[in-house]
């Protein structure tokens, strides 16, 4: 990876962590769940409003590291407007990007590619995947808190 691309990815993560998109809660959400990463101290709530089988709105309320907040911000931007099945596919794809020995291809201009550097730091993978795991719990109506441990 070139230095310019690495710098761009770092800039994307910082942008999303400093001014996260879709931060907040949704009153009368169709799905909501809480997540916790005890090792890093990340805590997140994810809220989903559906219109039929489509995600009409998604928000998160997070207290955590830059990686966790940036991942949640990118996640909500990507998934609003998608069907539940598309969201499940995107969630699986993202988690595979960070955890699979043979990750799927990702375009350099895909904002999620900014989080690929996390692969080098196994403890930080949990920071990046926590929002996505919490989203899955929100969509499935799980009342159990998601935890990375």
How would you label these PLM feature ranges?
Residues 1-27, 56, 82-149:
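C-terminal binding/interaction regions
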Residues 19, 23-59:
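Structured beta-strand/loop patches that form or line metal/cofactor-binding pockets in enzymes
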Residues 40, 65, 127:
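Functionally engaged cysteine thiol sites
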Residues 44, 73, 126:
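Active-site phosphate/pyrophosphate-handling residues
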Residues 62-69:
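Short, thiol/selenol-centered motifs that function as redox-active sites or metal-ligating centers
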Residues 69-70, 89:
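Alpha-helical macromolecular-interaction surfaces
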Residues 71-83:
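Alpha-helical support elements that line or immediately flank enzyme active sites
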């Amino acid at each position: 990876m070139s230095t310019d691309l690495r710098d761009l990815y770092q800039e994307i993560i910082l942008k999303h962590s400093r001014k996260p998109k879709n931060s907040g809660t949704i009153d009368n959400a169709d799905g909501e769940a809480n997540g916790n990463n005890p090792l890093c101290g990340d805590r997140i709530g994810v809220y989903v409003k559906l219109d039929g089988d489509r995600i009409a709105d998604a928000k998160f309320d997070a207290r955590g590291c830059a990686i966790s907040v940036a991942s949640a911000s990118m996640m909500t931007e990507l998934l609003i407007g998608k069907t539940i099945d598309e969201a499940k596919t995107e969630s699986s794809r993202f988690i595979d990007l960070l955890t699979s020995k043979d990750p799927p291809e990702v375009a350099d201009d895909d904002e999620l590619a900014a989080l690929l550097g996390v692969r080098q730091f196994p403890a930080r993978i949990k920071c990046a995947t926590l929002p996505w795991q919490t989203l899955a719990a929100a969509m499935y109506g799980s009342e159990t808190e998601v935890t990375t441990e």
